Amino acid sequence: MAGPRPRWRDQLLFMSIIVLVIVVICLMFYALLWEAGNLTDLPNLRIGFYNFCLWNEDTSTLQCHQFPELEALGVPRVGLGLARLGVYGSLVLTLFAPQPLLLAQCNSDERAWRLAVGFLAVSSVLLAGGLGLFLSYVWKWVRLSLPGPGFLALGSAQALLILLLIAMAVFPLRAERAESKLESC
């Protein structure tokens, strides 16, 4: 016979979810802002959402390409724009998730909880779509042995977003009727 969970267990689950959201935000900030969106950053290759530099054998230097040259290499402008929109939009939506989570916990508001789940779900879809679209265009230059810390951070953020969604679905917010709203914060 399963009884109600103790209050401390609910608080521990909530704090774990908040910590995971903060870790995802930090990973995405690191990859997209600190690393400037570079997924591969080697001395002879730099490929990211805003950099596309390949090694030039003739001059023995790293040559960065802009859009007319990128389209000739097979990287469409619209595709790269959609990939950027997906990845950076994911960061923005993830930044909005902690506030509804805190409001849901303090006010026992299931609608705010669902809003936070929605933000994280759309963020996960945008990140996966943007990263997948970008990798589909640059796959001939980037191999699995070449990902840099930015790519690993985005991949980890995606995995944690999926884990967050699973945790939030398995352990939904439970409204507590017996306590006042001030005691629940």
From Swiss-Prot:
Tissue expression pattern: Expression significantly higher in gliomas than in normal brain tissues.
Positions annotated as glycosylated: 38
Transmembrane segments: 12-32, 78-98, 115-135, 151-171
Location of this chain's protein in the cell: Membrane
One annotated Gene Ontology cellular component of this protein: membrane
Membrane topology (UniProt): Multi-pass membrane protein
Annotated keywords: Glycoprotein, Membrane, Transmembrane, Transmembrane helix
Protein name as it appears in the record: Transmembrane protein 140
Gene name of the encoded protein: TMEM140
